[in-house]
Amino acid sequence: MDEVAYDFEVLGPSEKDPETNDVLLVATRSENVEQRQAAVSAAGLTPKIVDVEAFALENACKLMQHQMPDGGIDRTMAVVDFGASSTTFSVLRNMKVIYTRDFTFGGQQLTEEIMRTYGLSMEEAGRAKKEGGLPGNFQAEVLDPFIDDMTQQVSRSLQFYLASGSGREQPEKILVCGGCANISGVADVIASRVGISAERGDPLGTMKLSSRAKAQAVARDATALLTACGLALRSFD
């Protein structure tokens, strides 16, 4: 137990047995918490709380209700958040997460493929991925295969969800988030491959921007800030 960080919260009487309480228990390896504490401290901040990504995502989805049919109320929605090295596929019913799948896949793979194909450094490949300027064969030889991998991962996750229990409802829409969501046309490709409407998720879409904020940068980075937005919405004592 020395290597485990955990916390719990009593949710209240159980629907199945009112004489007992439902308890939410969250546990992770201590090193996972320590790494995040170190990162926050290195930025000159003081960490006050560590939350679970699935809970943060659920909070953040409230900021994308303008992109959901009926604001997601009594609806089944899917959110896929492509990170650098890992991706989270979640399904929400009535704005509550009912299924989550994490898998190893992300934008880092595209960066590494650019490095291998064009002999660039990690920094050069990352900059070229965002700013462009790659050879004409980039789309066909590098980007299209990566997009194919993205759609396969979404399709596979959808099948896992549908097979995870009886009565699973197919999502009415998929919100595509994370840095990879900025790839031109990727949401349309995912929609055509899986047969479900898809759109780039924008958790900042209804927010007013400060005059000091760079609107173009915010618009570009918004979809990659899903977890950060969810954490920012979290209250604590």
Residue ranges and their predicted role:
Residues E19, Q67-Y99, Q109, I114-T117, ...:
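Gly/Thr-rich phosphate-binding beta-strand-loop-beta motif of the actin/hexokinase/Hsp70
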Residues E31-N59, K96-G136:
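Glycine-rich phosphate-binding loop plus the immediately following alpha-helix
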Residues M1-Q65, K173, P203-L209, A224-T227:
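Active-site neighborhood for divalent-cation/phosphate handling
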Residues E112, R116-T117, A125-K173, C180, ...:
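Adenine-nucleotide phosphate-binding core of ATP-dependent small-molecule kinases
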Residues F146, E169-E199, P203-G205:
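Glycine-rich phosphate-binding loops at beta-strand->alpha-helix junctions
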Residues A56-N59, A181, E199-D237:
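Glycine-rich phosphate-binding/hydrolytic loop that grips phosphoryl groups
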Residues E3, M68-M77, E124-A128, Q216-C229:
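A polyampholytic, Gly/Pro-enriched intrinsically disordered region
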